[in-house]
Structure formats: C-alpha cells, structure tokens
Amino acid sequence: MQTKLTQFFKKNTLDKSTTDFQKNETNIEQNNNIQKKTITIYTDGACKNNGKKNAIAGIGVYSENVYNISEKIEGRQTNQRAELYAILKALELTKIDDYSTVYIYTDSLYSINCITKWIYGWINNGWLDKKKKPVKNKDIIQPIYNIYKKYSNIRFIHIEAHTNKTDIHSLGNAKADELATLFNSAINKVV
C-alpha cells in the first residue's frame, strides 16, 4: 500500500493545476520585481531676434520613440523663456510615475540653476531677485519647480550646445535644437 501511495504522489505532484499554479506564482513574483524604465528627454529653446520687438521663440522637445515637439511659445518671446518652456512642456507630457528616472538634458545652465539653485532664495525673498525686483519668468519657473519637488526621480543634466559630436547626448540635443529652430524657420518662411 505504501508503494502505491508513493507512486500516486510522484505521478500527481506536478499535474496541470500544480504546474499552472507554479507558473502563476512565478509571474506574480516577476510582476512584483518589475523594474521601471528610465526616459531621456532633450529640450531646447530658440529665439530669432532675441531681445527685439519682432522676436519669435520656439521650443524643441525630443525623446526617441516617445514624442517630439516643435511649437511657438506664448507671451514674451525670449531665448530664456523658450528654454524654460521646453522643460515645462516635457515634464507636463511625461507620465513621470511610469519611470524610475526622468533625465532632462538641456544646454541651458540658466534653466537648471533657476529650478535647482536660485529658486530657494527667490521663494524666501517673496519671488524677488537680489535687486529686489520680481523674478523674471516666474510664470514658467514656478510650475516647473512644483513638478520637480513633487517627484524625486527627475534629473536635470547640462549638455554643451552645437558641438557637432556624434555621441548619443549630443545627437539628442541637436534634434531638440533642430525642432526649436525648425519651428522658427517655418514661421519665417510663411511671413
């Protein structure tokens, strides 16, 4: 009798339902250990006739296989506003929770400093700069900062502009620049 029971259990230990359960258990473990992916986004702003009344500013946002944006900015038309607006647009369109890290590459050290350094002094001073004047571009800086402080997975990385290098980040920056200037070129051709 003992031999028959042993043979029965050996034969039926891995029946279909047991095998299915083991597969499902493995899937659950794998699902619990899924690592989120990262995303790399390149942003750029461009302004033709910067500082003049006839200035036209546009943005370029490039992220391979996710989205590419080329559009004119609203309001005052300056290069710095365009650089900031490109970052804001990228953050607004990205489902930040879907990624372990969101890398924003920009050639605008001004934009990075606004969001990661200078803003703390501005907030403490009631959004006044060192000369006690209202901070320029607050309307764009503040919403970027609000997104930045909400998520701990956003990283800003400064990259050199117009290098003609062929590494992946230089090429990504060139694509963002092309999108920003493409928009300006299209406007100028229509006018």
Q: How would you label these PLM feature ranges?
A:
Residues M1-F21:
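Short linear clamp-binding motif
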